[in-house]
Amino acid sequence: RGLGAPDCIILPGTKNTVDDLLWLRQSGLEAAILKLAERGTPILGVCGGYQMLGQTLDDPTGSESGRQQTLRGLGLLPTRTVFSEQKRRVQVKATVAAAPFAGAELEGYEIHTGVTEAEGEPFAHYPDGGREGCVQGNVFGTYLHGLFDTGTLTEALAGWLCRRKGIDPSDAALIPMEEYRRQQFDILADGVRGALDMDAVYAAMGMEKR
């Protein structure tokens, strides 16, 4: 199965890293991703996607997959993940360390099982100086959800991808996630108003039409 010529590949989080890794492998998508990574296509793995990008995924108690096993990862990052029954749930702030996004401020959360040991360069640093995630060449991995909510990483990533294609980043119209959400809620509200008899709604509520 081919993926065409994407500007970037994002492997998202998953409810079951092991099962979805096996599906990637069996479907042929793993081979396609590896081929594109070798050609220099940027790969970003988030949470379970980050775990998949590593060398091995060890499930010693069967807490993730239902049986004891060690799986080969995609091998694109120098990391090893060991699953456990404990789940990490935490709100975090971090600063991206990885070029070309260095300096982007992040505010998000982690929610995952497993501990990942990384030997490569970190994707980001916590305020206390702790390392988060891993980077190797054009492959990036992080446990942080909400990467694109603050907008700074979104702008940095979009600008970098534009420059790789010879496009002026100033031509890319970007809006903060919160503003985008408000716009979508306004569109939804307008759609609801257009589909309802608002006079009847206000009358039923004992309110005057605004």
Spans of model-derived segments:
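Cysteine-nucleophile active-site neighborhood
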Residues: K15-A98, A102-E107
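Acyltransferase
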Residues: G4, R131-R210
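Residue-level signal for inorganic ion chemistry
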Residues: I9, C47, H145
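A glycine-rich phosphate-binding loop feature that marks nucleotide/adenosyl-phosphate handling sites
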Residues: R1-G4, P42, G49, V90-A94, ...
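Catalytic beta-strand/loop cores that center a nucleophilic Ser/Cys/Thr
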Residues: T95-G137
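Active-site-proximal beta-strand elements of phosphoester/diester hydrolases
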Residues: P12, G108-H112, F140-L144
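Short, well-ordered loop/turn and helix-capping segments at boundaries between secondary-structure elements
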Residues: R39, Q55-D59, T79-F83, E117, ...
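Terminal amphipathic helices with adjacent charged low-complexity linkers/tails
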Residues: L3-P12
